[in-house]
């Protein structure tokens, strides 16, 4: 069934929340801990990771709960409001001593991650249930990726400026408003949408997870997406450090974000057309290859040619747009095909496991970047004014470019084995 333009665009508003939440913590939380609260780099990386690791456990549970409730839409509003409030709390805690400030961040971020799980999982599950047309889902994802690009551009480009002008607490409140606009907007715009009634799954959560993970096409898609999320998470975590220590201009963080995300506004429709002609797998492979080349080229940030770094960020952004569009359109196809094959709707469990994997990748990114900094001898401070040794500067550059490029390149292997594009039905064999 064809969806109205209002529904396609309105659903995409939820990506203001997912794009913002997927960007700002990875961009600002690690440097907030190391350069404002004075937390050691390795400990800060662990602090960023723990709440996201909690989401890895919680997301399948959220999927299971939303499967049993049936309607996904009410979760968007309730969890969305909680998400906005708790995010603001993350950056409004005490400034010291470092141990007390770190505990505040962990507790507030845990609450924030919990709310996000109960928003993101039902949100991701909706496309498979409101339309049975794979092409329609791709159109939905095209709008969604465009909105994600705007959200990343807006939040990633302006949040550092708000920090500079007004401080971290004001930034937390500002981002909270963005999250509220996205979650409430998606809830209102999808009013009246009919979610296809399919038998809910029976059995324990463990049994449902076993069934979902036994679908080969899902495993392949999930592995590729998680590895890419890890690479992108590392890249995002390095932006503030690259701007401050390699480009010698903290404001360059916003410019890098504009260069990285801006092209997505133009190329998302092109990736959609490419996938329509060549297949979603081909689109995913091509965009992944572009992202690899762009990430490698980001090593130019360590040279005296910052213009090349911005150009490389733009190239990486072109690839990144496709690596968001393709898998987000492929996931509902796999879930819907599995539902047709089994007669049981496990879409919530599929999306719960999917978002858990994405969360794990994005969470590990800053943590691993923090470890790379620690190995390089990075010096933490409370004012961001510490002089970094050569090893730390090298770690900043390598962690920002080479490490993400290698990880994203590795994701090409499982993508090549995805079969739904070729067979017309998902590989659901155990």
Q: Where are these predicted regions, by residue range?
A:
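Membrane-embedded alpha-helical bundles of multi-pass transporters/translocases
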Residues: 1-430
């Amino acid at each position: 069934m064809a969806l109205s333009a209002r529904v396609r665009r309105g659903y995409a508003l939820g990506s203001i929340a997912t794009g913002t939440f997927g960007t700002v913590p990875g961009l600002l939380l690690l440097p907030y801990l190391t350069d404002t609260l004075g937390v050691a780099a390795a400990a800060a990386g662990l602090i960023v990771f723990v709440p996201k690791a909690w989401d890895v456990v919680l997301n399948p549970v959220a999927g299971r709960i939303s499967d049993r409730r049936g309607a996904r839409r009410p979760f968007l509003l309730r969890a969305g409001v909680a998400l906005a409030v708790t995010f603001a709390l993350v950056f409004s805690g005490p400034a010291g001593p470092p141990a007390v400030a770190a505990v505040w961040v962990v507790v507030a971020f845990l609450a924030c991650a919990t709310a996000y799980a109960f928003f993101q999982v039902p949100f991701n599950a909706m496309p498979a249930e409101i339309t049975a047309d794979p092409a329609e889902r791709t159109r939905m994802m095209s709008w969604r990726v465009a909105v994600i690009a705007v959200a990343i551009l807006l939040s990633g480009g302006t949040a550092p400026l708000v920090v500079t002008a007004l401080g971290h607490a004001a930034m937390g409140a500002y981002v909270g408003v963005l999250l509220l606009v996205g979650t409430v907007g998606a809830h209102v715009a999808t009013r009246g949408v009919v979610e296809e009634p399919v038998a809910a799954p029976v059995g324990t959560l463990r049994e449902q997870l076993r069934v979902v993970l036994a679908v080969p096409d899902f495993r392949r898609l999930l592995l590729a997406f998680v590895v890419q999320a890890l690479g992108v998470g590392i890249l995002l975590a390095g932006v503030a450090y690259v701007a401050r220590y390699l480009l010698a201009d903290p404001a360059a963080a916003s410019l890098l974000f504009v260069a990285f995300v801006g092209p997505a506004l133009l190329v998302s429709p092109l990736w959609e057309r490419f996938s329509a002609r060549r297949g979603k797998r081909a689109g995913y492979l091509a965009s992944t290859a572009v992202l690899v080349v762009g990430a490698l080229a980001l090593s130019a940030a360590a040279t005296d040619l910052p213009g090349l770094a911005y150009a490389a960020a733009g190239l990486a952004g072109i690839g990144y747009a496709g690596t968001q569009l393709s898998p987000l359109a492929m996931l509902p196809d796999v879930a819907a095909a599995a539902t047709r094959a089994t007669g049981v709707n496990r879409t919530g469990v599929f999306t719960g496991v999917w978002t858990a994997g994405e969360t794990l990748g994005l969470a590990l990114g800053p943590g691993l970047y923090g470890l790379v900094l620690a190995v390089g001898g990075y010096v933490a401070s409370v004012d961001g004014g510490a002089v970094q040794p050569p090893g730390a500067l090298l770690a900043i550059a390598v962690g920002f470019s080479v490490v993400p490029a290698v990880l994203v390149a590795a994701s090409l292997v499982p993508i090549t084995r995805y079969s739904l594009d070729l067979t017309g039905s998902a590989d659901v064999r155990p």
